[in-house]
Amino acid sequence: MKVLERLGNVGVVPVVVIEDVAQAVPAAGALLRGGVDVMEITLRTPAGLEAIRAAAAGCPDMLVGAGTVTTLAQCKQALEAGAQFIVSPGFDREMVAWCVENGVAVTPGCVTPTEIMAAAALGVNVLKFFPANVYGGLEAMKALSGPFGGVRFIPTGGVDAKNLAEYLAAPFVFAVGGSWLCAKKDIAEGKFGQIEKLAAEARAIALGFELGHVGLNRPDAEDSMAIVEQFNRAFGLAVKPGASSNFAGSAVEVMKSMYLGEHGHIAIKTNSVPRAVDYLKKRGFAADESTAKYKNGALAAIYLTESFGGFAVHLVQK
């Protein structure tokens, strides 16, 4: 999997400031236990480079990147230490061009049309938007996405658990960055359980799992319609005819054939089907690619290969 694809699948990129190299591996481990397997260790402290080296060596499952990289020399040092992606607060043409030429994933900070055009000219279309709260946040990125539709942003600064879902729901947001889930204070005080908890919370918000509907298998269209009409009479759920199934409101789908699942299926809504597929794969639950459905080129629904209590389960984009 490509580095940027992995960042997008996680959805949240912790911005980590390490003062003591000995804290790098415990911090990385806490994030991993919380379900976040990417981290951006900044070069804001003298320990930054060695922290990258320690985390990359000590936690091979963690995708470690370098942040606050402002020069090409720093970029090369970070890569030598084990960084797998480079994040810069601004746009340095020399550094970005070198990264592109050498196949290094880089997300430079770009907040103006001029900077975005300069990055796009080099083939870079995933950009850091920093500080997001100072430069207009979602409204600014939405405006910029008009003329630059091929660009997606990683807003950092002013993003936390309270507004994470709102940011990730925007189609022009690739992922978000932030220090709230791996705070400098928590690292310094050894509160790695708190870091794990915040990482898990952020991951849950990014995925947004919730029950969508329950699907029942029936042998034919006539039987399907009879059941949705029964739900209508009992609960007032509106009858919604469809090509392969009928719905009773939005809660019950009744198939017109004996479809997947011994008893039927359960739909789980999510904020991002691709993120959910990646998340579940890491937990041993595979997706059935033959059932994938796309909308506007994006994966919108897919079944899992495993059944749950006789029910097939499929993911549905909110």
What spans do the regions from the language model cover?
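Vicinal oxygen chelate
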Residues: 251-256, 281-318
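C-terminal helical cap(s) of enzyme catalytic domains, especially alpha/beta-barrels
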Residues: 99-104, 185-207
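N-terminal beta-strand motif that seeds the catalytic metal site of vicinal oxygen chelate
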Residues: 3-17, 203-228, 261-268
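Catalytic cores of alpha/beta
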Residues: 27, 71-81, 114-122, 139, ...
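Catalytic beta/alpha-barrel core
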Residues: 15-17, 38-45, 62-70, 75, ...
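Glycine-rich phosphate-binding active-site loops on the catalytic face of alpha/beta enzymes
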Residues: 89-95, 128-138, 172-195
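Conserved, mostly hydrophobic/aromatic
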Residues: 14, 31, 78, 127, ...
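Glycine-rich, proline-tolerant flexible connector loops at the mouths of alpha/beta enzymes
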Residues: 32, 36-59, 180, 185-187
